[in-house]
Amino acid sequence: MDLDTITSISTPMGEGAIGIVRLSGPQAVEIADKLYKGKHLLNDVPSHTINYGHIIDPESKEVIEEVMVSVLRAPKTFTREDIIEINCHGGILTINRVLELTMTYGARMAEPGEFTKRAFLNGRIDLSQAEAVMDFIRSKTDRASKVAMNQIEGRLSDLIKKQRQSILEILAQVEVNIDYPEYDDVEDATTEFLLEQSKEIKQEINRLLDTGAQGKIMREGLSTVIVGKPNVGKSSMLNNLIQDNKAIVTEVAGTTRDVLEEYVNVRGVPLRLVDTAGIRETEDIVEKIGVERSRKALSQADLILFVLNNNEALTQEDYTLYEVVKNEDVIVIVNKMDLEQNIDINEVKDMIGDTPLIQTSMLKQEGIDELEIQIRDLFFGGEVQNQDMTYVSNSRHISLLKQARQTIQDAIDAAESGVPMDMVQIDLTRTWEILGEIIGETASDELIDQLFSQFCLGK
């Protein structure tokens, strides 16, 4: 890989207590020393130390910033290269001036994800661990961050490497069979060993895939849409679940004119809550846009919370809306139980059949616990799995595991049908390659570049 030194701001832009400019590469310390004035040259201080001083413009001699500089020497760093982290006061102006000086004196602006890419290319982490870094940064709940951290620590990598090693052992036995075809006992032993080991590999792949649905929910959140006719209490429900007044709650029907979205942790289940504009015919241009977005959100939802008003009898609009959502995963909520009951609960039950029904009062915060328990039960069978398990949460990994399951099954079918071993070998080798794509050992350069381009600058 390139031996140049890269630089970037690694903290969010804007006002804050601290902003960090990070450098990585063989000239990181040398470049920093051209700008830094402190008690000692950075080149002379021990690794993994923080040093007080100032950043000086070498040309004008102007003091740019008062800083603390971290010196981290290869190979015991994230990138396995020399790393310098210049800790500045937070703010846009001075941190950009420091960044510009690092580039003026020899560093190149890092591409998105390039620090993590170097960690991968230098063997510090594999591809699945690199992807988990972004999952960790983007995680919205404690459980999601724990699942990502397990992957960063190599839990998934270790399992994949173990299965690939098992395939290599099978291939070695197959090679013996190909080299000595005249020995029937060798062929019989090879077939027996191949089938036994291949079925174990398939079983492990299936076990990982079984975690995929829950893993994806933990990674991305359960897309949960709150739907109902206007003014049934959808926004109040959103506010109670997120305990934040983001949605506008008024007595005027139709005041939610956009799709409002929040993440919330409901009894260990990360929900991506979406409050929609009421779905109805309207001549208002702005409201029409909100309704269209609501329909799109419904089509992409994992769970729908269908809200009815206890204070009003069922209307044709309620029936029409329920027809739209009834074939999805739905929980029906009769809200405003604090008001006079004008809805016929038996009529509601006739309409929804076996769909779960919860009665709530968002004003008095009644029924919220029952709703949260129902959400958990619907998707996790009443028990959220241990977060220390190895989950597969990445869509790319799930797709590759499905491909590997198919190719290992092809090898099993071929062996059981008496297909020549050199043909079985093709399916086994392909399985080994597919699993290698998960951890990056057989991934193409184009795929690697594409994955890291999705990272943020400075990471």
UniProtKB/Swiss-Prot annotation:
The keyword Cytoplasm is assigned to this record: yes
Query: Where the protein is mainly located, per its record?
Result: cytoplasm
Q: Where does (6S)-5-formyl-5,6,7,8-tetrahydrofolate bind?
A: R22, E85, R124, K459
- In this chain the TrmE-type G domain maps to 221-380
Q: Name one Pfam family in it.
A: TrmE_N
Identify the domain of life: Bacteria
Q: Mind listing the GO molecular function terms for this protein? A: GTP binding; GTPase activity; metal ion binding
Instruction: Please give the GO cellular component terms listed in this UniProt entry.
Output: cytosol
Q: Which SUPFAM superfamilies does UniProt cross-reference here?
A: P-loop containing nucleoside triphosphate hydrolases, TrmE connector domain
Decide whether keyword Ion transport is in the record.
no
What biological-process terms (Gene Ontology) are attached? tRNA methylation; tRNA wobble uridine modification
Q: Which residues bind K(+)?
A: N231, T250, V252, T255
Which UniProt key words apply to this protein?
A: Cytoplasm, GTP-binding, Hydrolase, Magnesium, Metal-binding, Nucleotide-binding, Potassium, tRNA processing
Indicate where this protein resides in the cell: Cytoplasm
Q: Which InterPro entries match?
A: G_TrmE, GTP-bd, GTP-bd_TrmE_N, GTPase_MnmE, MnmE_dom2, MnmE_helical, P-loop_NTPase, Small_GTP-bd
Q: How is the cofactor bound?
A: Binds 1 potassium ion per subunit.
> What is the disulfide pattern of this chain?
none
Q: What is its EC number?
A: 3.6.-.-
Cofactor(s) required for function per UniProt: K(+)
Q: Which residues bind Mg(2+)?
A: S235, T256
Q: Which family does it belong to?
A: Belongs to the TRAFAC class TrmE-Era-EngA-EngB-Septin-like GTPase superfamily. TrmE GTPase family.
**Protein function:** Exhibits a very high intrinsic GTPase hydrolysis rate. Involved in the addition of a carboxymethylaminomethyl (cmnm) group at the wobble position (U34) of certain tRNAs, forming tRNA-cmnm(5)s(2)U34.
Return the NCBIfam families for the record. mnmE_trmE_thdF, PRK05291.1-3, small_GTP
What assembly does the database describe for this protein?
Homodimer. Heterotetramer of two MnmE and two MnmG subunits.
Q: Which HAMAP family match?
A: GTPase_MnmE
Q: What is this protein called?
A: tRNA modification GTPase MnmE
